[in-house]
Regions:
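Charge-lined substrate channels and their catalytic hotspots, especially those that engage the 3′ end
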Residues: 1-106, 113-158, 190
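Short beta-strand segments
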Residues: 16, 108-110, 168, 176-178
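Short acidic-glycine loop/turn motifs at beta-strand connectors
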Residues: 97-99, 169-174
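Short, solvent-exposed aromatic-acidic interface loops
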Residues: 180-189
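Residue-level detector of conserved catalytic or cofactor/ligand-binding positions
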Residues: 191-199
Length: 199
């Protein structure tokens, strides 16, 4: 299978003139068929070298100054829930009891804005892609793997920077208070299989 581009189609001609863009591989091969699906729907399955280089150049350090500017949830029970084979953990939940009948629930999303500046090459590419695409056997990420699987992945027992929505609830699940802002967390990992097992 190949990807071709129509280069010219003369008026009155039954057939266009095309040019070879890329060889995908032998029909029937799993990688070939997956790449064929992505090509058919114009979904990019690799990043340009300049984007990968920009991702590698990002400073991974989380400084004490940065942590001091955030609400600290590192001592609160926090966990991700994803498939067992997941590599990108981009959201987590936290739960703690405030007092009898009152609970705090936090929804934590990886704070990509800490690492990706507006209108940078990575930001522009993410805007172009719009979302990560999940196929049966692979993920086509919105961000380079350096970000999606490392810097912006809420990996277990690591300091992670997040943007969070935090709600205080009563036993009837009425929202008593709400807060939105930047946080820092330590999360544990649960899998979908783990939480589905009977106790």
């Amino acid at each position: 299978k190949v990807v071709v581009r129509i280069a010219e189609w003369a008026p009155g001609s039954k057939s266009p003139v095309g040019e070879l863009v890329e060889r995908l591989g032998m029909a029937g091969n799993n990688d070939t068929e997956m790449h064929s699906i992505l090509a058919e729907y114009e979904l990019p399955y690799r990043f340009e070298p300049e984007i990968e280089e920009a991702a590698q150049a990002i400073d991974a350090r989380v400084t004490a100054k940065e942590i001091a500017q955030r609400r600290d949830f590192r001592g609160v029970t926090t966990f991700t829930v994803d498939p067992a084979d997941a590599k990108d953990f981009d959201d987590a939940l936290s739960v703690r009891k405030i007092k009898d009948g009152v609970w705090e629930v936090g929804v934590h999303i990886a704070d990509v804005t800490h690492y990706v500046r507006p209108h940078s090459v990575i930001d522009d590419e993410a805007v172009e892609r719009g979302t990560s695409v999940y196929l049966v056997d692979r993920t086509v990420p919105m961000l380079p793997e350096r970000l999606s699987n490392e810097l912006c992945s809420l990996r277990p027992h690591e300091t992670s920077l997040c943007f969070s929505a935090v709600f205080t609830l009563n036993e009837n699940l009425d929202i008593l208070e709400e807060w939105f802002g930047r946080t820092v967390i330590h999360s544990d990992r649960l899998s979908l299989i783990h939480i589905s097992e009977p106790t």
